[in-house]
A protein has these predicted regions:
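A short, N-terminal "cap"/entry segment at the start of jelly-roll beta-barrel domains
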Residues: 1-23, 34-37, 68-71, 108-129
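Conserved hydrophobic/aromatic beta-strand scaffold that supports enzyme active sites
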Residues: 14, 24-28, 46, 67, ...
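Short acidic-glycine-tyrosine-enriched beta hairpin
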Residues: 60-80
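A short hydrophobic beta-strand segment most commonly corresponding to one strand
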Residues: 46, 77, 91-108
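Short beta-strand His + acidic residue motifs that chelate non-heme Fe in jelly-roll/DSBH
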Residues: 36-38, 56-58, 78, 83-90
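Glycine- and acidic-residue-biased ligand/ion/polar-headgroup-sensing regions
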Residues: 42-55, 59-60
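A generic "binding-loop/recognition-motif" signal
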Residues: 20, 42-43, 53, 82-83, ...
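Conserved short histidine dyad/triad with adjacent acidic residue
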Residues: 25-43
């Protein structure tokens, strides 16, 4: 069982929560699923991919949209204020470490955005029947 469900719908497993300036969790997204698109108000994250394959969409203010393919060993940064969305490949769960600075302040940190950059059918998005 996950420790929490993130505002984007992914599963969260706490690894380090007692640090003062950062936090570390493992994030999991089931095979074939797509997260809800969100942006963070105050935190920056570094993601290190452990297992699975997938895609990550990002759009930072004043910059072009970008979609990156990810696999074990991939690393990327989610800067403060950038909209993002991620998707697990069709065959395996996507798992990554998420280092957050400052530490995750709570669900109010994530702000829903009106669109994402990964096209999904209604049953692929997390939280959909």
């Amino acid at each position: 069982m996950p420790d929490a469900i993130a505002p984007d719908g992914s599963e969260i497993y706490f690894l380090v929560g007692d640090a003062r300036r950062a936090s570390l969790v493992e994030v999991r997204l089931a095979a074939g699923q797509t997260s809800k698109p969100v942006r963070h108000r105050t935190v920056e994250e570094i993601w290190y991919f452990l297992a699975g394959e997938g895609r990550v969409w990002q759009q930072c203010p004043g910059e072009a949209e970008e979609v990156k393919e990810v696999a074990p060993g991939s690393v990327l940064t989610i800067r403060t204020g950038c909209a993002f969305q991620f998707q697990a490949g069709p065959r395996t769960q996507l798992r990554f470490l998420c280092y957050t600075s400052p530490p995750w302040p709570g669900d109010q940190e994530a702000e829903a955005v009106t669109h994402g950059g990964i096209a999904v059918s209604g049953d692929e998005e997390v939280g959909q029947p």
